[in-house]
């Protein structure tokens, strides 16, 4: 299992968020059935009467299974799905340079994790597929951390930006520029996208490669100020 955030996910997870409710299919998969925005990021298992019977784990970000603030009802969390953790583990060990990433992260490309294997899905079924859930780590208290396929791709985007030595404002401008290009209007990415990107960015910036690059840029800036 890939433990994001340097084997310490609590360092980079968001402190506040939403709660989520799921129903148990009895085969290791859970269907998202309810949820709301508040400070509780727990994923509660509920029975057919809506009574809470346990806690599956916690969400990676406050919006992991929400799309533009709307709960993606019917999306499936598969506790046996290791594809996201494997993707991020490989991405961390074989991080592409930022230009290679940009060329291969567009819709349908190899780094567009949310759409890998989507087939001919469209509309709401495609949206549920993009928000399919999987375990991405375990926090210091032993709680399982679950994220969506969309989270995985956005985390990777932030990671490569942070590891490349970009500042957050630079990365944010790039992400929003691409979103504006796709939307054919000036706009910013949504809260769900930004939250996962920021977690990945922090992890990338604090990686063994990201730290020296960032420190070098800071040193250069300080030198320029004293000229």
Where are the model-predicted features located?
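Catalytic Zn2+-binding segment of zinc metalloproteases
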Residues: 16-17, 159-170, 202-209
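Membrane-active amphipathic alpha-helices enriched in small hydrophobic residues
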Residues: 1, 153-157, 193, 199
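Hydrophobic alpha-helical bundle signature of multipass membrane enzymes
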Residues: 61-185
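Active-site or metal-binding loop neighborhoods of secreted/extracellular toxin and effector enzymes
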Residues: 171-227
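Short turn/helix-capping motifs enriched in Asx and small/polar residues
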Residues: 1-67
């Amino acid at each position: 299992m890939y433990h994001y955030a340097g084997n310490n996910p609590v360092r980079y997870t968001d402190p506040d968020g939403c709660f989520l409710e799921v129903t148990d299919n009895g085969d290791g998969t859970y269907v998202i059935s309810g949820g709301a925005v508040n400070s509780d990021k727990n994923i509660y298992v509920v029975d057919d009467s809506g009574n809470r019977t346990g806690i599956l784990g916690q969400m990676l970000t406050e919006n992991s299974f929400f799309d533009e603030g709307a709960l993606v009802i019917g999306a499936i969390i598969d506790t046996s799905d290791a594809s996201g953790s494997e993707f991020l583990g490989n991405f961390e060990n074989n991080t592409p340079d930022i230009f290679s990433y940009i060329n291969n992260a567009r819709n349908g490309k190899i780094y567009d994790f949310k759409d890998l294997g989507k087939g001919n899905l469209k509309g709401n079924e495609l949206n549920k597929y993009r928000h399919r859930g999987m375990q991405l780590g375990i926090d210091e208290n032993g709680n399982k951390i679950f994220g969506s396929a969309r989270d995985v791709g956005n985390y990777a985007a932030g990671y490569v930006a942070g590891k490349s030595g970009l500042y957050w404002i630079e990365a944010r401008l790039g992400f929003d520029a691409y979103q504006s290009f796709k939307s054919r209007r000036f706009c910013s990415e949504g809260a769900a996208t930004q939250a996962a990107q920021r977690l990945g960015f922090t992890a990338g910036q604090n990686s063994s490669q990201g730290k020296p690059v960032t420190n070098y840029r800071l040193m250069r800036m300080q030198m320029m100020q004293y000229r």
